[in-house]
């Protein structure tokens, strides 16, 4: 089975999680697929990165101290488009009940991926949300081929 990959540095992803192990794991896995990845330990740091770096997608934990991922995405959605206000976002969370998913979507997330993260599901979700990732993923041979 060939994992989906993106041309190096073509896809800019921001990982937001207060847990350093989760940040490292996701960063390493997605960089290994060719994405350019930055990581933030807090919602405040992430907002600055979004405004300055303009990632293609944010993957954020929702249960962080001080400010949650919900708070982050609500603030991001209030930004002008040229400051990152339309940046797509995936909630990456251990809260996986239907009401938790609904809360994430109502906050402004585009999708929800449960922890522990299934990397293939995360990659597929990225490909569904980010237009140029979708095109690149579609050009790859089907899994198992």
Predicted regions and their residues:
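Charged docking surfaces used in two-component/phosphorelay signaling
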Residues: 24-28, 32
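Acidic catalytic/metal-coordinating carboxylates
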Residues: 42-45, 68-74
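Short hydrophobic/Thr-rich beta-strand motif most characteristic of the beta2 strand and flanking loop
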Residues: 34-41, 49
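C-terminal output helix
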Residues: 117-126, 138
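Hydrophobic/aromatic residues positioned on beta-strands within the core alpha/beta folds
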Residues: 90-92
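The short loop immediately C-terminal to the conserved phospho-acceptor aspartate in CheY-like receiver
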Residues: 19, 58, 62-63, 95
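The C-terminal output helix
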Residues: 127-145
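The feature encodes the CheY-like receiver
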Residues: 23, 65-66, 97
